[in-house]
Design a protein with these regions (language model features):
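C-terminal, structured domain-capping segment
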Residues: 1-13, 57-58, 63-66, 101-137
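Generic preference for hydrophobic/aromatic residues in regular secondary structure cores
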Residues: 4, 8-11, 17-21, 71, ...
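Long, low-complexity ectodomains and other extracytoplasmic segments of secretory-pathway proteins
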Residues: 1-56, 62-65, 137
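An almost-null, non-specific background feature
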Residues: 18-20, 26-37, 66-68, 76-80, ...
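Surface-exposed binding patches on compact interaction domains or structured appendages
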Residues: 66-105
């Protein structure tokens, strides 16, 4: 005789990381505060966009594993027109974030870039920084 061996095999789906990233124009203008005669106060000055979604970055995870998405803003090295420019990111509830956990549910997750700085010394039209997005499993 021979020996009979019974084995158990598990077949698993391969892990698929598939992420779509879309973004608005990411064009910003610095707006000086203006006098509001109704409130007798100046409106807030700062960086604004033309359209509501211009500062947005949307990530959709169409894979089958959850991912972490890291957001980073780096000020352009040759930017001399603006002092102390900093970029940060907020989620859809305006909560600050550096990393967003995105489940594999094919639902879009929106993040927005917020800019803060001193008032620019003059008007200019050029790249003010770089956004880096890192996808991690």
């Amino acid at each position: 005789g021979g020996e009979l061996q019974i084995g158990t095999f598990t077949i698993t789906e391969p892990e698929i990381v598939s992420v779509d990233i879309t973004w608005g124009s990411l064009e910003f203008k610095y707006q000086d505060g203006k006098w509001d005669p109704e409130t007798c106060k100046y409106t807030e000055s700062g960086w604004t966009t033309e359209q509501e979604d211009d500062a947005s970055i949307t990530v959709t995870n169409s894979g089958n594993v959850a991912v972490d998405v890291e957001y980073r803003f780096t000020t352009a090295e040759d930017l001399t027109e603006v002092e102390h420019l900093q970029g940060s990111f907020v989620d859809e509830n305006e909560k600050p974030l550096d990393t967003l956990s995105v489940p594999a549910d094919n639902m879009p997750r929106k993040t927005e870039l917020r800019l803060e700085s001193d008032k620019p010394t003059k008007s200019f039209d050029k790249t003010i920084g770089t956004i880096t997005i890192v996808i991690k499993e």
